[in-house]
Amino acid sequence: LGPNVRIFDPSMSTAQIRAVVDQIAAQQVSNEFGPERYALLFKPGTYGTADDPLIVQVGYGTEVAGLGASPTDVKINGHVDVYNQCNANGCIALTNFWRSLSNLTIQIESKGLDGCRASGNFWAVSQAAPMRRVNVTGGNLTLMDYCTAGPQYASGGFIADSAMGFVINGSQQQFLTRENFKLRWERGD
């Protein structure tokens, strides 16, 4: 394995995993053109709890994936989020590229997050950021970040072979979906 591959297993505490993913997020969330790449891989099992959720922010050049045969083999009680990027011109998701999420289940648990962030799992991306074989339960999946400086723009992505209840499209300009189940789509006109 390369030096930037992190493999987690259910015997690790949420605090141990959080320390690693938070350190990577601190480096990668705004590292748009940096050369670093990370893979955060989860062995089959359950991570986080309702009282101590695992919250993962996915930055540039970061892959988050479950290593089970099925998305239900890896369950994260918490969030796996992408938020708007803020700079002198405002807070938007138009350059949230180069990250991915695959082959796991997110049971949304929001203890410790503010009211707006607790409202759902955020995947505010704009292209080159696929979500494949992901189940989202216990809350909404939102494809825009309406918490950081109010609703702002995002510009598309790809979701395939996934199951989720309610999806908030919001300001997304375009999103390609394929073979998704139990999907209820809410536009944000």
Indicate residue ranges for each PLM-predicted region.
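Feature marks extracellular polysaccharide-active and adherence modules
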Residues: K43, A65-S70, N77, L104-Q107, ...
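Parallel beta-helix/beta-solenoid
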Residues: A65, N89-G112, Q127-G138
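N-terminal extracellular ligand-recognition/capping segment immediately after the signal peptide
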Residues: P10-E63, A69-D81
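Predominantly polar beta-repeat domains that present long G/T/S/D/N-rich surfaces used to bind, process
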Residues: P3, L101, M131, V136, ...
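Short glycine/acidic-rich loop motifs that flank beta-strands on beta-rich extracellular proteins
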Residues: V29-N31, Y47-P53, D73-K75, H79, ...
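Surface-exposed or flexible loop/turn and strand-edge residues in extracellular/cell-surface modules
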Residues: P3, R37, D51-P53, G59-G61, ...
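Sequence/structural signature of small/polar-enriched beta-strand/turn repeats
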Residues: H79-L94, L101, T177-R178
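Long, contiguous C-terminal flanking segments immediately downstream of a protein's structured core
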Residues: L1-N4, D22-N31, L67, K182-D189
